[in-house]
UniProtKB/Swiss-Prot annotation:
One of its GO terms (biological process) is anaerobic cobalamin biosynthetic process. It is an enzyme of class 2 (transferase). Pathway: Cofactor biosynthesis; adenosylcobalamin biosynthesis; cob(II)yrinate a,c-diamide from sirohydrochlorin (anaerobic route): step 6/10. GO terms for molecular function: cobalt-precorrin-5B C1-methyltransferase activity. Keywords: Cobalamin biosynthesis, Methyltransferase, S-adenosyl-L-methionine, Transferase. It comes from the Bacteria. PANTHER family: COBALT-PRECORRIN-5B C(1)-METHYLTRANSFERASE. The keyword ATP-binding does not apply. It catalyses: Co-precorrin-5B + S-adenosyl-L-methionine = Co-precorrin-6A + S-adenosyl-L-homocysteine. This is Cobalt-precorrin-5B C(1)-methyltransferase. It comes from Listeria innocua serovar 6a (strain ATCC BAA-680 / CLIP 11262). Its EC number is 2.1.1.195. Pfam families: CbiD.
Length: 373
């Protein structure tokens, strides 16, 4: 696919989704049955309305059945499914109905709360509609077919995705809101985080623990001893996920994370990528100064590359109260961020250090344990 975007001055090639792959393979199958000859490429309209010519990597056909495969091309966005083959079988039937299912390597939903019903193949609504429409257009109104999408590498590749967190077991999902993969875009990632949050809400939870990643997850379960059922990753998208908790009407949010990540939120930085915003040292220096720390400590902390290194200096100088001050500021900033939209969300914060463990919490830990057990 020769379409590009520019990001930070660099040129990146776009790609196409697993949903577009499946639609293209399905169309190739119908064309092979119709014409009784192999098809090297097909033109498909993506879910977003873009017309693409997609190469077909594998072809096999008989009078009423065909198999085709399309290799997933994520462009310069090398995700978990990039390069894998998405296979489709299409078989003509005597019924006018067109049906779609997933086979080997396509995950199955095992929990309520996502856009796929429990027991169904993990083919999301937009690509499902697109695949069915593509086949229907090729067949006409009076003929029917069964469509089976499968991916021999799917179960292994799914280990690199968030599917297990969403209760999708046994393989990958067939995805694609627009059908196009845009490199350097966070939208797909954010959508998957939202899906997990929606699933928790649909299961009846009204309070949630947001963690930046695995460190936070481990700390919640292994140090604090809280249940894992309430945990959802927010990655670097703190502001986005806070807004999502409000949209979904969660009553309480507990943010638990490494101090080096959450300290940024105390200064109003709600997307915590280091490439976008850092300011860890500056935030620490400013808060230490307000506590009356000596200039020599401020100068040494300002030189530190990590909050772990700064922590040694802060502890030695007896200014560990700075962590409590900053934790309260994280809470205040987060609640202010949601202030002008209803419903209100109660937010608490726990921060920790890899070396020193628990640093600060906006409530007594035992009170939090009682609330979140």
């Amino acid at each position: 696919m020769e379409d590009f975007i520019y990001y930070n001055g660099k040129k990146y090639r776009k790609g196409y989704t697993t949903g577009t792959c499946a639609a293209a393979a399905a169309k190739a199958c119908v064309e092979m049955i119709e014409n009784q000859e192999e098809v090297s490429a097909v033109k498909v309209t993506t879910t977003g309305g873009t017309i693409l010519e997609i190469p077909v990597a594998y072809q096999q056909f008989s009078e009423k059945k065909a198999t085709a495969a399309v290799q997933k091309d994520g462009g310069d966005d090398i995700d978990a499914t990039h390069g894998m083959w998405i296979f489709v079988d299409v078989e003509l039937t005597d019924s006018p109905e067109v049906t779609l299912d997933g086979g080997v390597g396509i995950g199955r939903a095992t929990q309520k709360g996502i856009s796929v019903e429990v027991g169904e193949a993990a083919i999301n609504p937009a690509p499902r509609k697109n695949i069915l429409a593509t086949v229907r257009e090729s067949l006409g109104e009076n003929r029917g077919a069964t469509i089976l999408v499968y991916a021999p590498e799917g179960e292994e590749r799914a280990k690199r995705t968030m599917n297990s967190n969403l209760g999708i077991i046994g393989g990958i999902s067939i995805l694609g809101t627009t059908g196009i993969v845009t490199p350097m875009s966070d939208e797909g990632w954010k959508k998957s985080l939202s899906m997990e949050l929606e699933m928790k809400r649909n299961q009846g939870l009204d309070q949630i623990i947001l963690v930046p990643g695995n460190y936070g997850d481990d700390f919640v379960q292994n140090t604090l001893g809280f249940a894992s059922d309430n945990i959802v990753s927010m990655s670097n998208f703190v502001g986005y996920m806070l807004k999502e908790t409000q949209r979904l009407a969660f009553k309480k949010v507990l943010m638990v994370g490494h101090f080096g990540k959450l300290v940024k939120v105390s200064a109003g930085i709600f997307t915590t990528y280091s490439k976008d915003a850092d300011a860890r040292a500056e935030i620490l220096v400013a808060n230490l100064a307000l506590l009356g720390a000596p200039l020599s400590l401020l100068q040494e902390v300002e030189k530190c590359n990590t909050t772990e290194a700064a922590g040694e200096l802060i502890e030695a100088a007896g200014f560990t109260q700075v962590y409590e001050v900053i934790a309260q500021k994280i809470k205040a900033r987060s609640e202010r961020f949601l202030k002008f939209t209803k419903p209100s969300v109660e937010i608490d914060v726990v921060t920790f250090s890899t070396e020193r463990g628990l640093l600060a919490a906006t409530k007594d830990i035992e009170v939090l344990r009682e609330e979140w057990r």
